[in-house]
Amino acid sequence: QVEDVVKKAGETFGRIDVLINNAQASKSGVSLVDHTKEDFDLAIYSGLYATFFYMREAFPYLKESRGSVINFASGAGLFGKLGQSSYAAAKEGIRGLSRVAAAEWGPFGVNVNVVCPLAMTPGLEKWKDEYPKLYAQTIQGIPLGRFADPEKDVGRVCVFLASEDAA
């Protein structure tokens, strides 16, 4: 359970300075009308609910350390990408949850941020293969002309957001 994981991390390391919520499962590539409740639940439970539960359980530790939360969301909800209804719904929920947490937890010194990386991941590779025209259109709208590199681009942003420089 989430409570046990967070408690174990706090006991093992003596504190929790940073919480990064990045896990997400979904049935990308499935149109809205073809989604089942199980498909939708997969995205909501693995993304939005997981983020909520980890944030809730980690808050006492983060409050004590004046730590940081970095939640991963996506442009999928912002831009309405085909075949990503449940994924987009979960990620938009995470963005809203994060905004509320930033307002509520900021006075306690806890920094809450959202990263919407559009990084080249296995899930995005699948989407690229299933929607090549949409992929090409998306690339044209990115100033660098490419998706982010998970380590070089996204990882460095997370390191900064977890640092005192971002507070």
PLM features: what roles do these ranges have?
Residues 2, 30-32, 36-41, 138:
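Substrate-binding pocket helix/loop in short-chain dehydrogenase/reductase
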Residues 13, 61, 147-167:
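C-terminal substrate-recognition "lid" of short-chain dehydrogenase/reductases
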Residues 35, 80-88, 100:
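Active-site loop-to-helix junction immediately N-terminal to the catalytic Tyr of the SDR YXXXK motif
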Residues 55, 90, 98:
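Active-site helix of classical SDR
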Residues 60, 103-107, 167:
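Alpha-helical segment proximal to the catalytic Tyr-Lys
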Residues 74:
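Residue(s) in the substrate-gating loop at a strand-loop-helix junction
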Residues 132-152:
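Catalytic Tyr-x(3-8)-Lys segment
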